[in-house]
Curated annotation (Swiss-Prot):
BrlA, abaA and wetA are pivotal regulators of conidiophore development and conidium maturation. They act individually and together to regulate their own expression and that of numerous other sporulation-specific genes. Binds to the sequence 5'-CATTCY-3', where Y is a pyrimidine, making both major- and minor-groove contacts. Residues 114-131 have a biased composition (Basic and acidic residues). InterPro entries: TEA/ATTS_dom, TEA/ATTS_sf, TEC1_TEAD_TF. It comes from Penicillium roqueforti (strain FM164). Belongs to the TEC1 family. This is Conidiophore development regulator abaA. The gene is abaA. GO terms for cellular component: nucleus; transcription regulator complex. Residues 97-111, 236-246 have a biased composition (Polar residues). Residues 61-134, 213-272, 708-732, 767-792 are annotated as: Disordered. Its main location: nucleus. Residues 83-94 have a biased composition (Basic residues).
Length: 792
């Protein structure tokens, strides 16, 4: 029994979790510490059928770690100096090409059975530093060095007056990546060992042998430049590690292609505080589960049996990030994660890691006194900058674990983690529960095999495989920043609301097939962004519509807001209804003939023809001026039922509101705010003037002149404007209307005399015009109105 493994986390051996579990074996895993188990002969026998009903009872609470002492100012200074030295030491790591990692992750030989069997062998040879010559860290650096230094045969790479062979470049690369030296001979020996069982693999041949065509064409040429040295001489804008921080969020949003008429995609970030978001980024991950023999070091490289071990790089996942919605049945597999995603008050602002664990079970019980070890490490330190964001200063680390079977909760535990002094956090993964589970599964398998019935053995194996397929887990790691700790000191024992979610781990399990090695892969999951920050997806049957240009928007804005001309009676027809938005109905049938004359009484065809504006109710309100859409789509006007004046000025036209929404836009206009609604009707055409007119006046044809005589309702007069304009805000005095007769005195000859008809003919044309209301002020006695609106 190992009593020296994490002595501060020892748990009593007579706890309820160690009830009898089997009737066939005299050995079972016994919990001794947080993540280490030991085999013991002190467990009694019991039935196997009680296994499924016992798992939900096991919940362990570990004691609090020692209270952290506040760091002094010199201590903080030393940390900054250490981080600076660490950054200087690993500065050249940025020279790694961005494509080397992706190519290495796709190498087939890393997933081959022979390579995995070689890596799971115990490492017996140690270097001068007392560590295995090719540990997992060095093996990962070695694989990166193979990608960064292409094969060069017997040629050399010259730099600073010295020649380097490929093995020397690989050894130098490993030293700069890990800080551990391996000689040229050690690199050569390791290559020979790997080549003995990887020879013939296309990916391996590409890394160790130079193509024949390239070798024959460059016999007298120089060796190919190492990729990482070329990158140093010609630095690029992004590096391998520099572009690693949250690559999924930017790439995912960049892949969204907007279509015509759509809003631009927003800048998507996780969380409101950039520094806190970067602090919760996981830069390294490690997970192993193994059994150590008695009197043997409790390490994965000395393991008696490895249930699973991390596959690939410790600092980079093997698979690219994947949207959370692409995980089949993630809501039923991870109910706790689903509740976090649906919580709008506490959005996910940390990394979500998906771990797919393949477990290789033991065929028999291990020797008495063996121990189960589980190593789970999360590294928040940047590979080159270290702990510059102060993750090691965070306190009150907690870990909650939820284990499910077919969406039914089997186990729920909460643990307080000891304060970390580095950037690595070691969450607990319920090793006692796993020890009991492995013992019971092995017990069932032995009972089935000893029965002599092959079908019973197959049923036991199928039962175990089905159990692992239905098994899932969710872990949430939280911590409190130093600033939150200082604020929470005012309230004794109250810091739960101040904690920050640091990571969410989603676990899926399966049992390996015969002959396979247990491996674990990890990848980041991208939660669906909030609906308020992204555009609605484009429907499959959508039709692209040309967006309005800026010129059309500006042309619809009124040019003079201070001058108001009194409208004509035919333009101001009042409808006895409530206040609604005003829409321009039609253009004037003809312009005022009197405007053809300049003030001197001469005909002037070079000047523009001025026309009185439609009315006060057609003015654009302030809210629509602030909106980015054209006023012609959904104009807002002063909601006034009538315009009242003491001088007898005519009133304005009020019509019912038309719910016209542009089919290509998702906005509707109102007086209070603009609400986003999905477009539902695609049959409305804004340019269909007939449908708009029929909505007001019916489908029958009627002269517009008759409309002002028989279908208009006139209201009383007042000097106030109700609606959008508050009482007392504006006062509109009107000047008395007067008509200025048009003088037709003798005119001076000008350059258009040859083009115009004679004066007698013009007199006949003008004299025959009547002064009736049907002329709308265009008769010979008509004048022009001159009224202004002054804002008080």
């Amino acid at each position: 029994m190992a009593t020296d493994w994490q002595p501060e986390c020892l748990v009593a051996q007579n706890q309820p979790s160690l009830d009898p579990v089997g009737a066939h074996s005299d050995r079972a895993l016994q919990n001794t510490t947080g993540n280490v188990q030991s085999y013991s002969d002190q467990l009694a026998h019991a039935g196997v059928t009680a296994r499924d009903d016992q798992f939900h009872q096991y919940s362990f609470k570990y004691p609090h770690g020692p209270h952290p002492q506040p760091l002094s100012a010199p201590g903080l200074h030393q940390q900054h100096v250490a981080a600076r030295l660490h950054q200087r030491k690993l500065r050249r790591l940025h020279s790694v090409g961005p494509n080397s990692q992706s190519r290495r992750a796709q190498s087939s030989y890393l997933k081959s059975q022979k390579y995995m069997e070689y890596r799971r062998r115990p490492r017996r040879d140690t270097g001068k530093d007392g560590e295995p010559v090719w540990s997992d860290e060095l093996e990962d650096a070695f694989q990166q060095a193979l990608e960064a230094n292409p094969p060069m045969g017997r040629r050399k790479w010259s730099e600073r007056g010295k020649s380097y062979g490929r093995n020397e470049l690989i050894a130098e690369y490993i030293f700069k990546l890990t800080g551990k030296r391996r000689t040229r001979k050690q690199v050569s020996s390791h290559l020979q060992v790997l080549d003995s069982f990887l020879k013939g693999d296309p990916d391996w041949e590409r890394l160790v042998r130079e193509p024949a065509l390239e070798r024959s064409s460059s016999v007298h040429g120089s060796a190919p430049a190492p990729k990482w040295r070329t990158a140093v001489e010609h630095p690029s804008g992004s590096s391998h590690y520099g572009s690693h921080t949250h690559p999924s969020y930017h790439d995912h949003m960049r892949s969204m292609q907007p279509y015509a008429g759509d809003l631009p995609p927003p800048h998507y970030t996780l969380g409101s505080n950039m520094q806190e978001t970067a602090a919760s980024t996981i830069h390294g991950f490690s997970f192993d589960m193994w059994v150590s023999a008695p009197q043997q070091a409790n390490r994965i490289d000395k393991a008696l049996h490895a249930y699973t071990r991390l596959q690939g790089d410790l600092h980079h996942p093997v698979a690219p990030p994947m949207p959370l919605e692409h995980v089949n049945g993630w809501r039923s597999s991870f109910p706790q994660l689903a509740s976090m995603v649906d919580d709008v008050n506490n959005p996910l602002d940390c990394d979500i890691i998906l771990l797919e664990v393949n477990l290789e079970l033991m065929t028999d019980f291990p020797p008495t006194g063996s121990r189960l070890g589980i190593q789970l490490d999360l590294d928040y330190g940047h590979p080159s900058a270290g702990d510059v964001l102060g993750v090691s200063q965070m306190d009150n680390w907690t870990c909650s674990t939820h284990i499910y079977q077919d969406s039914q909760k089997l186990l729920e535990t909460y643990h307080d983690l000891p304060k970390t002094q580095s950037t690595k956090v070691k969450p607990l993964f319920e090793s006692s529960w796993w020890a009991k589970l492995f013992t019971q599964l092995t017990q069932e398998k032995r009972i089935a095999e000893d029965s002599g019935n092959p079908q019973a053995a197959r049923d036991a194996d199928d039962h175990a495989r089905q159990f692992f397929r239905s098994l899932s887990a969710v872990q949430e790691i939280r911590a409190t920043s130093p600033s939150s700790c200082r604020l929470s000191n005012q309230y004794q024992g109250h810091h739960g609301d101040e904690s920050k979610r640091m990571a969410v781990l989603a676990w899926k399990f399966r049992q390996t097939r015969p002959g396979e090695v247990g491996t674990t892969t990890w990848r980041r999951l991208i939660p669906a962004p909030d609906r308020t920050t992204t555009n609605s997806p484009r429907p499959a049957s959508a039709v692209d519509r040309v967006p309005l240009s800026l010129d059309s928007i500006l042309l619809n804005k009124p040019s003079h807001q201070g001058i108001y001309q009194a409208p004509h009676p035919h333009d101001l027809i009042h409808h006895p209804s409530q206040s609604q938005s005003q829409w321009p109905m039609y253009q004037s049938p003809h312009d005022n003939v009197s405007n053809l004359y300049n003030p001197s009484g001469h005909l002037d065809f070079m000047s523009s023809i001025s026309k009185a504006e439609d009315g006060l109710n057609d003015k654009i309100a302030v809210t629509s001026v602030l909106d980015s859409f054209s006023a012609s789509l959904a104009p807002e006007s002063i909601s006034s039922t009538s315009l009242h004046g003491s001088s007898g000025a005519p009133v304005m036209l009020n019509v019912h509101d038309l719910p016209l929404t542009h089919p290509g836009m998702g906005y509707t206009m109102g007086h209070e705010t603009s609400h986003y609604v999905p477009s539902q009707h695609h049959s409305v055409n804004m340019h269909d003037s007939n449908s708009v007119l029929h909505g007001f006046f019916g489908s029958h044809t009627q002269p517009l002149d008759d409309l002002s005589h028989g279908h208009g309702s006139w209201g009383t007069h007042s000097t106030s404007i109700p609606g959008d304009v508050g009482a007392g805000s504006y006062h509109i005095p009107y000047q008395a209307e007067h008509h200025g007769p048009v003088s037709r005195e003798s005119q001076q000859p000008h350059q258009f005399d040859g083009l115009l008809p004679s004066e007698d003919l013009m007199d006949k044309i003008v004299g025959r015009m009547s002064n009736g209301s049907g002329m709308h002020g265009a008769g010979p006695d008509a004048g022009y109105d001159n009224a202004t609106v002054d804002a008080v």
